[in-house]
C-alpha cells in the first residue's frame, strides 16, 4: 500500500498536515464519545477524527505523498459515521475526500449531499471539484466502509476511471475523463461546506 494511518495517537501525527480554521476538527477518544448519547465509538482503535460542521472553512488532514502516476490505479478506504442529528437549513453539497494534483488542483472527489427539507444524506464520486449527479443515499447513525478506485489518466484518451463502494457494494462508476496532472495529495475531511450545514457531526 502507499499510505496507511489511524488516529490512535489522539492527533494528526500520521498525516502530513492539518487545516482547521475555526477549530471544528478534533480527535476524541472512545471515552469522550461514550459520554455523548447516541454517539458511536471509534470504528477501530481508541480514537477517531471528528468534524462538527458550522462554517465554510476546510477542516481536513492531508497525505502529501499519495503519488498516483499517469495510467496507475490506486484504491482508498476509510470509515465514515454521520450522526443522527446531522442537519442543514439549506441544501448543501460538500467534499469529504479529494484527490489533488500539484497546485493544489482538485482532480476528483467524494462528496456528500444533504437535503434541508428531509436531512437525507447522499454520497457520490466525480471527476472535478464537486459531485453533481449519481448520488446514493447513505444512512446516519451507523458506521460505513467507504472505498474508492482511482485510475489516473493525464495523456489524451480519456481513460480515467473512478469507482465508489459503500459497505462493499459498488454504487457509482465514472469513466471517460482526463486529469490535468498526476495525483500527489489525498485530503480527508470537509471542504466547501455552507455555514447552514451546522448540526451534528461526522467521524
Task: State the predicted function of each range.
Residues 48-77, 128-133:
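Secreted extracellular polysaccharide-interacting domains
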Residues 86-98, 157-161:
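Beta-strand acidic-aromatic groove motif in beta-rich domains, primarily in extracellular
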Residues 11-51:
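Extracellular glycan-recognition surfaces and repeat-rich motifs
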Residues 78, 145-176:
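Carbohydrate-binding surfaces in secreted/extracellular proteins
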Residues 123-145, 154:
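Short, aromatic/His-centered strand-loop micro-motif at the edge of beta-sheets
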Residues 92-124, 134:
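Glycan-recognition/cleft segments
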Residues 174-202:
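Flexible glycan-contacting loops in extracellular carbohydrate-active proteins
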Residues 9, 67-73, 79-87, 99, ...:
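Solvent-exposed strand-to-loop "edge" motifs in beta-rich extracellular domains
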